[in-house]
């Protein structure tokens, strides 16, 4: 959406997360299982076949095995990522990307504290994982801003708007720039 605003495209819409997820799983041959996805493949999918509006194929996770209707694929061709790039986890590059008006997506390792009631209520995840904390999986999100005073990134989650700060949360700079905690960082620059 941000790249559409930046490009001043006539129609601005929220991309369908489930359309991307299904087509990503198709690339990875994992449609039969809800096993997550690689961001790189999701970006490739949007580059190859585009994405339809969320309103057309809404995020209903129970439909993760269902192929979107043909109309979604026709509409998706109007919105293909034609210029995208991988980013390094260098703080200056990540902040520079955001300062230029481009959000970025990335994956991060989720630890138990991220799913705490406090993070769900406030959206603030202010610390790195503790040594005795267990990893419970990975998650893909979109970074939309940063706060130098607090040393954290502002991130959009794909979960409902009742979670965190109306669907947003924060992670410390040190979390997002750690190659042991975050990876697969991409930005889309042009959609056509």
PLM feature spans:
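Acidic helix-start/capping segments at beta-turn-to-alpha-helix junctions
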Residues: 12-28
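Alpha-helical support elements that line or immediately flank enzyme active sites
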Residues: 1-8, 100
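Short, glycine/acidic-rich hinge or "gate" loops at secondary-structure transitions
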Residues: 8-16, 56-57
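Predominantly the structural core of cysteine protease catalytic domains
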Residues: 24-156, 161-192
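Generic hydrophobic, aliphatic-rich segments that mediate packing or membrane embedding
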Residues: 1, 16, 38-42
